[in-house]
């Protein structure tokens, strides 16, 4: 049995051409290039993971800045992202709750209407990176900075596995530093919102960056974790937003 992925802009037979989203060749490549750049930054960040983590763990982040970063976490939390998408659904007449019936559940372009396809693409883009991160966390253990004996590590690679664990007992979450799910959700949400509302690109990007930095400032993640989590989110955007035209998406 061969599974095929519908092309961006393809539509089910009961949708007219006027109800289809326009195609903008090259958009997918831009998402993939951005994801590649973040992955490279993530690899390079291994060289600064330990000093940055030690600095944050020592409580040197200014309290006012930390308070601001903590407020931005809502943009990266699954519950917060859900609330934001629900708000967009209620306020934007160009969005409708997607159908989960077959064949609509097969792929966003099989949704009964363009408005439902838009919402389905936004939901999938927001969730894709986070789901990929959860899968990696099942396979790779990395001790979070808050639970690691950072001073005894020769390099950031020592934080993988359980050798860097500072205490004899730790929660399951303490082993799940790599990569950052919060950064993945925040970046995926920012990509989805930017696709639908291009004028807010800088604002959404700033929210995603703040939410990701909050994870480093609170000793929940290393810099490499957030870079690679964001890279996975943009790879998800390449899959679910692909070459759909942002300008067309912004029209209700």
Identify what each model region corresponds to.
Residues 24-28, 32, 92, 156-252:
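Membrane-embedded catalytic cores of phosphoryl/pyrophosphoryl-handling enzymes
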Residues 40-47, 130-135, 208-219:
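Aromatic-anchored segments of alpha-helical transmembrane domains
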Residues 2-102, 138-150, 154-158, 169:
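N-terminal transmembrane-helix/juxtamembrane module of multi-pass inner/ER membrane proteins
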Residues 42, 82-89, 126, 130, ...:
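Alpha-helical transmembrane segments
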Residues 54, 104-195, 199-200, 208:
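Membrane-interface loops
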Residues 24-32, 36, 61-71, 75, ...:
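Structural motif marking the loop-to-transmembrane transition
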Residues 48, 90-91, 96, 128, ...:
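Hydrophobic membrane-targeting signal helices
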